[in-house]
Amino acid sequence: MSLVAIGINHKTATVDLREKVAFSPDKIHDAMKSLASRTRSGEAVIVSTCNRTELYCNNGDEADIIEWLEEYHGLDHQDVAPCLYNYHGQAAVRHLMRVASGLDSLILGEPQILGQVKQAFVKAKEAGTVALTIDRMFQNTFSVAKKVRTETEIGAAAVSVAFAAVSMAKHIFSSLSTTKVLLIGAGETIELVAKHLKDNGVASMVVANRTLERAQSMCEEFNATAITLAQIPDFLPKADIVISSTASPLPILGKGMVEKALKQRRHQPMLLVDIAVPRDIEPEVADLDDAFLYTVDDLHSIIEQNKASRKEAAEQAELITEEQSHLFMEWVRSLESVDSIREYRSQSMAIKDELVERALNKLAQGGDTEQVLIELANRLTNRLIHAPTQALTVASRQGDLNTLGQLRTVLGLDKN
């Protein structure tokens, strides 16, 4: 039994090559069936994200799997091979556990990868490319990722601006589910902020953008309300949290607009997070009572502190993946021992059946009973001791005392 992990990721390849080896959702079902057909066990899972494409197989040949990947995407070996990494046995299991735990991610400890690995596993089950070993490998991996999350602080500290902004909001408001949020801008950073807010239970979001169409497109995913920048004064008084990130050269929110909104809110506190450069919110807003303004510099200082915290947590997480991958391989070896015992017994029974049938035929033809039994015993003995005798001979000729000692123990030659 041989577990193999072959992949390419953000550390080894450019985005251009990663795009070429990626598998689209509508094709991954058939791709996994095709890959599984190249393994002896029919087991394969493909994990394909923007940052990585990885193939996990049981009883597959490394060179054959790489050839399949290149053929599937129509790529030249010399273009792909230098960017590939591969792991076998326990190293393959540990790599999967590290990936699912966020230890191999671009942002250390990011939680999204676990969901992506789970989704890949579900698709593999739907494709019928999962059997006992791969199933157990992935189920154990999900348990390990959960263990890493609960027993370390790997995911507790924010290490991206978007995540840090939402984490700050969580510290100030006891529950985000009842807060009203105004997002200004509709770019990638604000979209990521919206995702983190949704994951934390925020149900009421308004997205303000210069072009309404872009805001509407983003709002569909998050069930939010889209408005233009000109409508901000009407919605600002309702906002408990304001997070802004636009490319505007001039501030979007001035001190006067925020002051007016706070009066309408009867001086309920408002958190404002400005993650734009240049700034979207006038710095004088921080002088207002009940307005709590944080800039991207404030967030970066938090992020740097948290990176150090995550590195400490990562060291603990690495120990967990090492221990758990070792335990998994012990289970795999127990399966192999059961298979070996079954195969050895089956082989011995086949020899016995063959020789007994030959002896019965001779008896039926009038052969001497004593002679037939002696011949049966001799033939059976010779056949059964043939392989052990060969192994002992080879070990003796090579002076391999370790193997010789193990063989003597297995064959019971050292018993008194």
From Swiss-Prot:
CDD domains: NAD_bind_Glutamyl_tRNA_reduct. Pathway: Porphyrin-containing compound metabolism; protoporphyrin-IX biosynthesis; 5-aminolevulinate from L-glutamyl-tRNA(Glu): step 1/2. It catalyses: (S)-4-amino-5-oxopentanoate + tRNA(Glu) + NADP(+) = L-glutamyl-tRNA(Glu) + NADPH + H(+). The record marks 95 as: Important for activity. It holds the Pfam family GlutR_dimer. Substrate binds at residues 49-52, 105, 110-112, 116. NADP(+) binds at residues 185-190. Its EC number is 1.2.1.70. The active site is at 50 (nucleophile). The keyword Isomerase does not apply. The keyword DNA repair does not apply. Gene3D superfamilies: Glutamyl-tRNA reductase, N-terminal domain (3.30.460.30), NAD(P)-binding Rossmann-like Domain (3.40.50.720). Homodimer. Catalyzes the NADPH-dependent reduction of glutamyl-tRNA(Glu) to glutamate 1-semialdehyde (GSA). NCBIfam families: hemA. Possesses an unusual extended V-shaped dimeric structure with each monomer consisting of three distinct domains arranged along a curved 'spinal' alpha-helix. The N-terminal catalytic domain specifically recognizes the glutamate moiety of the substrate. The second domain is the NADPH-binding domain, and the third C-terminal domain is responsible for dimerization. This is Glutamyl-tRNA reductase. The gene is hemA.
